Amino acid sequence: MIDRKLLLQDFDKVALSLKKRNHAMGDELERLREVITHYKKQLIELEGLQAFQNKVSKEFGIKMAQKVDTSDLKKELENNKIKLNELSKSVGELEQQIDLKLSIIPNLVDEKTPLGASEEDNIEIKKILTPRVFTFKPKEHFELAQQNGWIDFESGVKLAKSRFSVIRGFGAKIYRALIHLMLDFNEKNGFEIIYTPALVNEKMLFGTGQLPKFKEDVFKIENENLYLIPTAEVTLTNLYNDTIIGVENLPIKMTAHTPCFRSEAGSAGKDTRGMIRQHQFDKVELVAITHSKESDAMQEHMLESASEILKALELPHRFVQLCSADLGFSASNTIDIEVWLPGQNCYREISSVSNTRDFQARRAKIRFKENQKNQLAHTLNGSSLAVGRTMVALMENHQQEDGSIHIPKALEKYL
């Protein structure tokens, strides 16, 4: 959540950030401006009534001590108190309206984030490893998976519905091996391995920004205040919800393997075949909580950590700086890692490493204490990596002409 003080003091800065995101709030934004104007006016009036109450109360005390008639002052105090209570209630209601609007306003766009109107304006930063030149037409992963008997898409539909799959046989061993490899690499880079619940309450999803705005994107348990997590970002970040951390304990670096669940609202017709876009998928996540001065360096560290895994698996990939219009709700700056898929003849996202600055920390009340003063921390998150998409990339990049898959040396010891 952005700072309410910033909204009150520099409304135009917030409006400009929304414009950079190509985020249309239109009349809603103007109504918010009107509410803020009304709130400021009432706040000044409230402060005046409070000052008057304090002044008259002092006079009342002096006259009482002097045993002078105070009946007029008493009546004045009582009348003013009624006005004070009514206005205080009105100001409180306006604050609630502002905070409700604040909860659905996305993060401010970072100065480093380039302006853009769509994902077409994202900027390639660098490429790592050169894509292989095939002497045959490479197949897509779902063809290879079915040929090798590794992924059963029909059973996924039978057990649940479309966008679910069953991984079996040697494919399941590769899937498990990838998870272990990812966790080992992340641990080597200083991230603590943590296993968390796959269900969280509403407060946790508010903390990381999924609620209230993206309610349609998550699965809710019927008759329970519980939701299936869309990412371990939710659980890892919220381990420190409403917590004050000693500055000496920063940075906090965590990694977790979890199943993730997403409704994929708005994705009809996209990636309908294969494992690219599933309702349930596994992901190994990185989350960091840092001092406000250290989050930029941490973002670079997290990117390199994820890239290290792809290099070990001999998978060509690139870093892509997202433009302002392609940023996620909570992100101030995001760099994607896209892996090369020869079967599709394109790069596809396999990780997004985002710096949310103090946006999530303000929502979740994650603070650190330095020099006896509490400050908002910065939080970062990123995949390291999406397991299914890594398996997709492994199959497509290391396929042989007969449909068999070469296993990279780094993965051999996990099989």
Curated annotation (Swiss-Prot):
This protein's name: Serine--tRNA ligase
Pathway involvement of the protein, from the record: Aminoacyl-tRNA biosynthesis; selenocysteinyl-tRNA(Sec) biosynthesis; L-seryl-tRNA(Sec) from L-serine and tRNA(Sec): step 1/1
GO cellular component entries: cytoplasm
Job of this protein: Catalyzes the attachment of serine to tRNA(Ser). Is also able to aminoacylate tRNA(Sec) with serine, to form the misacylated tRNA L-seryl-tRNA(Sec), which will be further converted into selenocysteinyl-tRNA(Sec).
Top-level lineage group: Bacteria
Reaction(s) catalysed by this chain's protein: tRNA(Ser) + L-serine + ATP = L-seryl-tRNA(Ser) + AMP + diphosphate + H(+); tRNA(Sec) + L-serine + ATP = L-seryl-tRNA(Sec) + AMP + diphosphate + H(+)
Complex and partners: Homodimer. The tRNA molecule binds across the dimer.
GO BP terms: selenocysteine biosynthetic process; seryl-tRNA aminoacylation
InterPro entries, sorted: aa-tRNA-synt_IIb, aa-tRNA-synth_II, aa-tRNA-synth_II/BPL/LPL, Ser-tRNA-ligase_type_1, Ser-tRNA-synth_1_N, SerRS_1_N_sf, SerRS_core, tRNA-bd_arm
Family: Belongs to the class-II aminoacyl-tRNA synthetase family. Type-1 seryl-tRNA synthetase subfamily.
Positions bound to L-serine: T231, A232, E233, E285, S383
Sites where the protein binds ATP: R262, S263, E264, E349, I350, S351, S352
Keyword Metal-binding annotated: no
The EC number(s) this enzyme carries: 6.1.1.11
Notes concerning its domains: Consists of two distinct domains, a catalytic core and a N-terminal extension that is involved in tRNA binding.
Coarse class of the protein's main subcellular location: cytoplasm
Subcellular location: Cytoplasm
Alphabetic keyword roster: Aminoacyl-tRNA synthetase, ATP-binding, Cytoplasm, Ligase, Nucleotide-binding, Protein biosynthesis
